[in-house]
Every structure is written in C-alpha cells, then in structure tokens.
Amino acid sequence: MKVSFFETGRYPVNSDTPREWPVPSAAYDPEAGAKAYRAMVERARFVQKLGFDWISLSEHHYSPRILTPSPPLSAAHIASQVDGIKIALLGPIVPASNPIRVAEELAMLDTMQPGRFVFGLLRGTTNEYLSYDLNPKEARERTDEGMELILKAWAEPQPFGWQGRYFQYRTVSIWPRPPQSPRPETYALGVSAEASEFAARHHLGLGVSYGSIDLMAQATGYYRERCAEYGWEPGPDDIIYRCNMILGETDEEADAALERRKSAQAPFPIAANLARALIDQDRRNVGGEARPANVGRVLPISFCGGPERVIKQLRQAREQIGVGVVDISLTDPGSGDTGAMMEKLELFGKKVLPHIREV
C-alpha cells in the first residue's frame, strides 16, 4: 500500500477569523499567507523523509480552509524545491475550468518532470460552483464533457475542432503534449456511478473520498465491474482513498479525540440558507443513497486508534475497497494544531507506515 499526505496549505486562522463561507478577504494576512506557502514545502520535505510516497493537493476557493485555489501552481511550487516525492493534483475542478487550459498546464508539469505528477479530474462540490457562478445541475455533464476534451487534447496529434454543449473551440492543438504514453497517471474522482463509468471506459484510475469503508467498497466494486465489461482489470494502484484519520499513541487517546469531534462544526461552514440552495440533486452513490454536501459539520473519520488498531483498519480497507493508495489527513483541513499534526505524522511514519508496505 502507498501512502499520500493531503496538503491543504494550513493558513493559520485565529479567533478573529470569520467562521463562514465565503470568508471575507479582508481577514487575509499577507505575511501569514506567505508563511503558509513556505510551510507547504517544509511539510513536503518532512513527509518525504518519513517515507510517504505522495503529497496531494486539491482545488478550493474563497476560504483559508484549503489554500490551494490553483493546484498546478502549488504543485510547481513544491516540485521546484523538493525532489523525489510524487505530487498528486486531486483535482482541478473540471466544470469550473477551461478544459484546454487544464490540459495545457498539466501537460507542462508532465513535461517538466515526467512521471512525477499524478492527475485527478474532479467534479467538485456545490459551493465551488458558486465561486464561478455555475449551475450545479449542469455539473455532471460539464465534468464529463470537460474530461473528454482534456483526454483528447492530450492524445490527438493533429488539430481538431470541438463543438460540445458546454465547450466550443474552432481549433485545439496543445503544446506541449504530455511525454507519457498513452497519458500521464490519471484518475477520475468521485463515488458516483457516472465517475466509475467514465473511469472504466477510459482506462483511468478511480479516486474516492471520505465515505465509510463499506460505502467506498460499493463504489470501487462497481468500478471493477464496469472495467471488466470494458475488457480490463484495474490494479490496487488504480484506486485512491482520501480519508481523515485520528492517530494516537494509544487507542484511548484517539477515541477521546474522536469523542470531542462529535459535536464539532466545520471550521468554515456554508450558511444554512445557502446550503439549502446548493444541494446537488443528482449526486448519488452507486448504492443509491442520497449524499447531500457535507455542510456545517466536520468531515467523517475513517480511521481512528493507536498504531496497531490503525494498521488493522488500513488492512481492512485494502481488503474491502481494494485501495492501493491511501491519501490521509490527520486533522480536518484548516483546523487543529499544526504542531500536533506534525507529531502525529511522525508517529504514523514510524509506527504505521513500515507495517502497511506489504499490504
């Protein structure tokens, strides 16, 4: 099993930081922002020394919760100063982006350091659509069309036109093209049946996130079924599971931390009236359960315990989900104590990581 660290930027919030979304930019401190980006590089070096395989980034807007509105820029920043560790961009958010620009920027990264970057194509959540004034009901179709266009732009050696429902280009011919063939290491991200179908049809990996092991096993099971129908079999490294983890020196320490979270609110929740307006009506998992956006609550914990219990839980995830890459956050993005998180990362690197390599 490979292990990735989910890097959020970790802007240092304080008691005066507004707890709402969007967070007014008047609260932004330029010195704190610069410090946060320097710390991203320091953490990348730290987790690399601990033996982590990847560091991952994700696109979010209008909040200090995750300070990476442009994953390609963040990836280039880390890659220019830290050697070796792979960098996973999970996503960009496809429906909120210009697909040609995404294809070009990711191709640039792959050309600069071939094989070092991993790309995930993401549909995103409803509040992110509001950032760029998009209709949430169109997100699924915009995502599929945008991903189709990105893949074709990477692969097509001759100029072509594109006249889709959401994107129209008279001529597409990107420079540079990715040096890897048939494409860079790429995943479709999401637990929906549509995400699994797209990934299977295009021979892509699948990235799932934040659901229970049982629910994620349904999603990856459906993905493998669809892959079989398209005549290929995904391996463990074709499945990424992003998740939150509470790791303690003992089970009791971790359980106490979990108990404290039960009444916690998300660090920057969407206002209730906005939340009701932004429920993504077609976001359903492969088991048919409605999954509205996680609004006003902290994200769920997938793994909790001391090192021995967490090792057992990770083995269970490997067996049930078939996951080959686990992408972990040891505290909720944007909350918690950074110093304590670094201590838990070191504990994970010393007491957990060596025991899951063979899983």
Regions found by a protein language model. Give the residues of each.
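Alpha-helix-loop-beta-strand connector modules within alpha/beta enzyme cores
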Residues: 65-89, 345-359
